[in-house]
Protein backbone atom coordinates (compact mmCIF):
# COMPACT_ATOMS: atom_id res chain seq x y z
CA UNK A 1 0.00 0.00 0.00
CA UNK A 2 1.36 3.39 -0.84
CA UNK A 3 0.28 6.99 -0.72
CA UNK A 4 -0.34 8.82 -3.98
CA UNK A 5 2.68 10.99 -3.20
CA UNK A 6 4.91 7.93 -3.63
CA UNK A 7 3.52 7.11 -7.07
CA UNK A 8 5.38 8.30 -10.11
CA UNK A 9 2.39 7.95 -12.39
CA UNK A 10 -1.11 6.60 -11.92
CA UNK A 11 -2.72 4.17 -14.31
CA UNK A 12 -4.98 6.29 -16.49
CA UNK A 13 -7.70 3.81 -17.29
CA UNK A 14 -9.95 1.51 -15.37
CA UNK A 15 -11.82 -1.42 -16.79
CA UNK A 16 -15.43 -2.31 -16.07
CA UNK A 17 -15.42 -5.67 -14.32
CA UNK A 18 -17.76 -8.48 -15.25
CA UNK A 19 -18.47 -11.19 -12.66
CA UNK A 20 -16.46 -14.25 -13.65
CA UNK A 21 -17.40 -16.71 -10.92
CA UNK A 22 -18.91 -16.96 -7.47
CA UNK A 23 -16.83 -18.82 -4.92
CA UNK A 24 -18.39 -21.87 -3.25
CA UNK A 25 -19.63 -21.68 0.31
CA UNK A 26 -17.24 -22.71 3.06
CA UNK A 27 -16.85 -26.48 3.01
CA UNK A 28 -14.76 -26.93 6.14
CA UNK A 29 -16.14 -26.46 9.65
CA UNK A 30 -15.20 -23.38 11.65
CA UNK A 31 -11.66 -23.61 12.97
CA UNK A 32 -10.54 -22.89 16.51
CA UNK A 33 -9.33 -19.31 16.21
CA UNK A 34 -6.95 -19.48 19.17
CA UNK A 35 -5.17 -22.56 17.79
CA UNK A 36 -4.93 -20.86 14.37
CA UNK A 37 -3.35 -17.81 15.99
CA UNK A 38 -0.96 -20.05 17.91
CA UNK A 39 0.11 -21.89 14.72
CA UNK A 40 0.26 -18.78 12.50
CA UNK A 41 3.57 -18.54 10.66
CA UNK A 42 4.90 -17.07 7.44
CA UNK A 43 5.66 -19.73 4.85
CA UNK A 44 8.09 -18.92 2.06
CA UNK A 45 8.34 -22.35 0.42
CA UNK A 46 5.13 -23.63 -1.15
CA UNK A 47 4.05 -27.06 -2.35
CA UNK A 48 4.21 -27.36 -6.12
CA UNK A 49 0.50 -27.91 -6.62
CA UNK A 50 -2.61 -26.06 -7.62
CA UNK A 51 -5.01 -24.80 -5.00
CA UNK A 52 -8.62 -25.90 -5.15
CA UNK A 53 -11.42 -23.42 -5.64
CA UNK A 54 -12.72 -24.50 -2.23
CA UNK A 55 -9.41 -23.59 -0.58
CA UNK A 56 -9.40 -20.17 -2.24
CA UNK A 57 -13.02 -19.66 -1.17
CA UNK A 58 -12.12 -20.63 2.40
CA UNK A 59 -9.24 -18.18 2.59
CA UNK A 60 -11.10 -15.25 1.01
CA UNK A 61 -14.45 -15.80 2.73
CA UNK A 62 -12.78 -16.12 6.14
CA UNK A 63 -10.61 -13.04 5.59
CA UNK A 64 -13.71 -10.98 4.83
CA UNK A 65 -16.22 -12.75 7.10
CA UNK A 66 -17.02 -9.57 9.01
CA UNK A 67 -17.98 -6.15 7.78
CA UNK A 68 -15.07 -3.69 7.68
CA UNK A 69 -14.42 -2.26 11.14
CA UNK A 70 -12.73 1.02 10.25
CA UNK A 71 -12.81 1.62 6.51
CA UNK A 72 -14.88 0.59 3.52
CA UNK A 73 -12.20 1.91 1.16
CA UNK A 74 -10.22 -1.34 0.92
CA UNK A 75 -10.43 -3.44 -2.26
CA UNK A 76 -9.11 -6.99 -2.51
CA UNK A 77 -7.48 -8.30 -5.69
CA UNK A 78 -6.55 -11.91 -6.38
CA UNK A 79 -3.79 -12.96 -8.77
CA UNK A 80 -4.57 -16.60 -9.59
CA UNK A 81 -1.76 -18.58 -11.16
CA UNK A 82 -2.57 -22.19 -10.22
CA UNK A 83 -6.13 -22.68 -8.98
CA UNK A 84 -8.11 -25.69 -10.19
CA UNK A 85 -11.45 -24.55 -11.61
CA UNK A 86 -10.33 -20.95 -12.03
CA UNK A 87 -8.77 -19.46 -15.15
CA UNK A 88 -5.39 -17.82 -14.47
CA UNK A 89 -5.67 -14.06 -14.18
CA UNK A 90 -6.19 -11.06 -11.95
CA UNK A 91 -9.57 -10.79 -10.24
CA UNK A 92 -11.25 -8.36 -7.88
CA UNK A 93 -13.01 -10.00 -4.95
CA UNK A 94 -16.44 -8.80 -3.84
CA UNK A 95 -16.93 -9.93 -0.23
CA UNK A 96 -20.65 -9.12 -0.29
CA UNK A 97 -21.37 -11.68 -3.02
CA UNK A 98 -18.34 -13.96 -2.79
CA UNK A 99 -17.79 -13.16 -6.46
CA UNK A 100 -14.59 -12.69 -8.41
CA UNK A 101 -14.56 -10.33 -11.39
CA UNK A 102 -11.82 -10.85 -13.96
CA UNK A 103 -9.77 -7.74 -14.64
CA UNK A 104 -6.83 -9.31 -16.54
CA UNK A 105 -6.78 -12.75 -18.16
CA UNK A 106 -3.78 -15.07 -18.27
CA UNK A 107 -1.05 -16.24 -15.94
CA UNK A 108 0.53 -13.30 -14.14
CA UNK A 109 3.09 -15.04 -11.92
CA UNK A 110 6.12 -13.40 -13.52
CA UNK A 111 4.46 -9.99 -13.51
CA UNK A 112 3.40 -10.30 -9.87
CA UNK A 113 6.93 -11.43 -9.00
CA UNK A 114 8.36 -8.37 -10.75
CA UNK A 115 5.89 -6.11 -8.95
CA UNK A 116 6.95 -7.77 -5.69
CA UNK A 117 10.58 -6.66 -6.08
CA UNK A 118 11.42 -9.83 -8.02
CA UNK A 119 10.77 -12.06 -5.03
CA UNK A 120 10.39 -15.77 -5.84
CA UNK A 121 7.90 -16.14 -2.99
CA UNK A 122 5.53 -13.92 -5.00
CA UNK A 123 6.31 -15.20 -8.50
CA UNK A 124 5.97 -18.85 -7.49
CA UNK A 125 2.77 -18.56 -5.46
CA UNK A 126 -0.34 -20.34 -6.69
CA UNK A 127 -2.34 -17.32 -5.49
CA UNK A 128 -1.38 -13.78 -4.53
CA UNK A 129 -3.69 -11.31 -2.79
CA UNK A 130 -3.24 -7.53 -3.05
CA UNK A 131 -5.18 -4.85 -1.20
CA UNK A 132 -5.81 -1.38 -2.63
CA UNK A 133 -7.79 1.67 -1.51
CA UNK A 134 -10.64 3.38 -3.33
CA UNK A 135 -9.90 7.12 -3.43
CA UNK A 136 -13.54 8.21 -3.54
CA UNK A 137 -14.28 6.19 -0.41
CA UNK A 138 -11.28 7.71 1.34
CA UNK A 139 -12.58 11.21 0.59
CA UNK A 140 -16.04 10.34 1.91
CA UNK A 141 -14.67 8.74 5.08
CA UNK A 142 -12.97 11.95 6.19
CA UNK A 143 -9.73 13.10 7.77
CA UNK A 144 -8.70 9.82 9.38
CA UNK A 145 -9.65 7.69 6.38
CA UNK A 146 -6.14 7.11 5.07
CA UNK A 147 -4.89 5.88 8.46
CA UNK A 148 -7.98 3.75 9.03
CA UNK A 149 -7.72 2.17 5.57
CA UNK A 150 -4.17 1.03 6.36
CA UNK A 151 -5.37 -0.48 9.63
CA UNK A 152 -8.24 -2.20 7.81
CA UNK A 153 -5.78 -3.58 5.24
CA UNK A 154 -3.70 -4.95 8.12
CA UNK A 155 -6.79 -6.62 9.57
CA UNK A 156 -7.50 -8.23 6.19
CA UNK A 157 -3.87 -9.40 6.03
CA UNK A 158 -4.07 -10.99 9.48
CA UNK A 159 -7.33 -12.70 8.56
CA UNK A 160 -5.76 -13.99 5.33
CA UNK A 161 -3.15 -15.78 7.45
CA UNK A 162 -5.85 -17.29 9.64
CA UNK A 163 -7.97 -18.26 6.62
CA UNK A 164 -4.97 -19.96 5.04
CA UNK A 165 -4.27 -21.79 8.29
CA UNK A 166 -7.88 -22.96 8.52
CA UNK A 167 -7.50 -24.47 5.05
CA UNK A 168 -4.19 -26.15 5.95
CA UNK A 169 -2.29 -23.70 3.76
CA UNK A 170 0.52 -21.25 4.36
CA UNK A 171 1.16 -17.71 3.25
CA UNK A 172 3.64 -14.87 3.49
CA UNK A 173 2.87 -11.17 3.74
CA UNK A 174 4.98 -9.05 1.42
CA UNK A 175 5.03 -5.32 2.00
CA UNK A 176 7.80 -4.58 -0.48
CA UNK A 177 6.66 -3.94 -4.03
CA UNK A 178 6.85 -1.48 -6.88
CA UNK A 179 3.79 0.80 -6.70
CA UNK A 180 3.46 1.39 -10.44
CA UNK A 181 3.96 -2.23 -11.48
CA UNK A 182 1.39 -3.47 -8.99
CA UNK A 183 -1.09 -0.74 -9.97
CA UNK A 184 -0.75 -1.73 -13.64
CA UNK A 185 -1.01 -5.44 -12.83
CA UNK A 186 -4.28 -5.12 -10.92
CA UNK A 187 -5.62 -2.34 -13.17
CA UNK A 188 -5.87 -0.11 -10.14
CA UNK A 189 -6.58 2.97 -12.23
CA UNK A 190 -6.72 6.53 -11.02
CA UNK A 191 -9.41 5.72 -8.47
CA UNK A 192 -7.38 3.25 -6.41
CA UNK A 193 -4.19 3.44 -4.37
CA UNK A 194 -2.02 0.34 -4.08
Model-derived regions: residue spans:
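N-terminal accessory segments that position/regulate proteins before the catalytic core
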Residues: 1-153, 167, 175-194
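Hydrophobic pocket-lining residues that define ligand/cofactor binding sites across diverse proteins
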Residues: 164
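Residue-level detector of anion-binding/catalytic polar loops
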Residues: 170
Amino acid sequence: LAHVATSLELVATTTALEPALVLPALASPPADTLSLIERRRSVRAYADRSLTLGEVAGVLRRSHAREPSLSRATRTHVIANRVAGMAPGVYRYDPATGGLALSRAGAQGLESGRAGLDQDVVAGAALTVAVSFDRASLRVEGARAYRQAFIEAGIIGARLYLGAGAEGLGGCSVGAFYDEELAHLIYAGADLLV
